[in-house]
From Swiss-Prot:
Residues 44-88 form a coiled coil. The keyword Cell cycle applies. The keyword Coiled coil applies. The lineage of its organism: Bacteria, Pseudomonadati, Pseudomonadota, Gammaproteobacteria, Enterobacterales. It comes from Escherichia coli (strain K12). Contains an N-terminal coiled-coil domain and a C-terminal TPR domain, separated by a flexible linker. The N-terminal domain forms a stable trimer and controls the oligomeric status. The C-terminal domain, which can also trimerize, is involved in interaction with TolA. Keywords: Cell cycle, Cell division, Coiled coil, Periplasm, Repeat, Signal, TPR repeat. This is Cell division coordinator CpoB. Mediates coordination of peptidoglycan synthesis and outer membrane constriction during cell division. Promotes physical and functional coordination of the PBP1B-LpoB and Tol machines, and regulates PBP1B activity in response to Tol energy state.
Length: 263
C-alpha cells in the first residue's frame, strides 16, 4: 500500500507540474494575444516601414545632392585646367618670341599670317572684372574704333577700357593697317599696369609680325627694357644689340645704345 501510494503521489505531482503552466497560459488576458495586440504590432510595423522609407528617401536625395556637387566640382576642375593650359601656352609663346628677338632668329622675318594664327589662340585677355566694363561698341569702321580706343588711352581713368577696346579692334579688324599700333598700345598699357609678361608678348608681336612697322624698333627696345627689369641682363643686352643692328638711326636704337652704355 505504501509503495502504491508513493507511485500515485508521484504521478499526481508530475501532472500538477505539467498542468500548471498550461493553466497559467489559459488564464492569461485575451488582449495580449487577441486582435488588439496584432493591430498594435501592425501599426508598429507600419511606423517602422514608413521611417525606413523616409530614411531611404533622404539618403537618395543626399546622394543626388552629392552627385550634383561632384559634377560641379568636376566642371570647375576642368575649367581651371583649361585656364592653366592657356596660361602655360601663353608663357611658351612669350618666351619663344623673346628668345627669337634676343638671338636675332629668322622667326622675326616669317610671314605674319602664320604668326597671327598662332598668337590668336594665346593672346592675353583683359581681367574678367574689366572685360565688359565700358569699352566702346563696335562701329563697323576701323578708323572710328581705333580713334575711340586712342581716346580711352588718353583718359587715365579708363585704361582698362582701352585695353579691351584694342583687343576687340585686333579681333574685329585682322587686316587693318593699325594692327601694329594696336599691339604696341596693348604692350604699353600692360606694362603700365605691371603686367610685364603680357607687355612683352604684345611688343614682341609687333616686331615679329610687323618688322617693317615704324613701331617695330621701339617695341623691340621695350622688350629689352622688360628683360632688364626682370633681371635678365644677358637677354636685355642681346635685344638692345638687335635693335641697333636692325633699326639703325631710329629712336629705339638710340635708346638701346644708351641702355647698353649704362650697363
Amino acid at each position: 500500500m505504501s509503495s502504491n501510494f508513493r507511485h500515485q503521489l508521484l504521478s499526481l505531482s508530475l501532472l500538477v507540474g505539467i498542468a500548471a503552466p498550461w493553466a497559467a497560459f489559459a488564464q492569461a488576458p485575451i488582449s495580449s494575444v487577441g486582435s488588439g495586440s496584432v493591430e498594435d504590432r501592425v501599426t508598429q510595423l507600419e511606423r517602422i516601414s514608413n521611417a525606413h522609407s523616409q530614411l531611404l528617401t533622404q539618403l537618395q536625395q543626399q546622394l543626388s545632392d552629392n552627385q550634383s556637387d561632384i559634377d560641379s566640382l568636376r566642371g570647375q576642375i576642368q575649367e581651371n585646367q583649361y585656364q592653366l593650359n592657356q596660361v602655360v601656352e601663353r608663357q611658351k609663346q612669350i618666351l619663344l618670341q623673346i628668345d627669337s628677338l634676343s638671338s636675332g632668329g629668322a622667326a622675326a622675318q616669317s610671314t605674319s599670317g602664320d604668326q597671327s594664327g598662332a598668337a590668336a589662340s594665346t593672346t592675353p585677355t583683359a581681367d574678367a572684372g574689366t572685360a565688359n566694363a565700358g569699352a566702346p561698341v563696335k562701329s563697323g569702321n576701323a578708323n572710328t574704333d581705333y580713334n575711340a580706343a586712342i581716346a580711352l588711352v588718353q583718359d587715365k581713368s579708363r585704361q582698362d577700357d582701352a585695353m579691351v577696346a584694342f583687343q576687340n579692334f585686333i579681333k574685329n579688324y585682322p587686316d587693318s593697317t593699325y594692327l601694329p599700333n594696336a599691339n604696341y598700345w596693348l604692350g604699353q598699357l600692360n606694362y603700365n599696369k605691371g603686367k610685364k609678361d603680357d607687355a612683352a608678348y604684345y611688343f614682341a608681336s609687333v616686331v615679329k609680325n610687323y618688322p617693317k612697322s615704324p613701331k617695330a624698333a621701339d617695341a623691340m627696345f621695350k622688350v629689352g627694357v622688360i628683360m632688364q627689369d626682370k633681371g635678365d641682363t644677358a637677354k636685355a643686352k642681346a635685344v638692345y644689340q638687335q635693335v641697333i643692328s636692325k633699326y639703325p638711326g631710329t629712336d629705339g636704337a638710340k635708346q638701346a645704345q644708351k641702355r647698353l652704355n649704362a650697363m
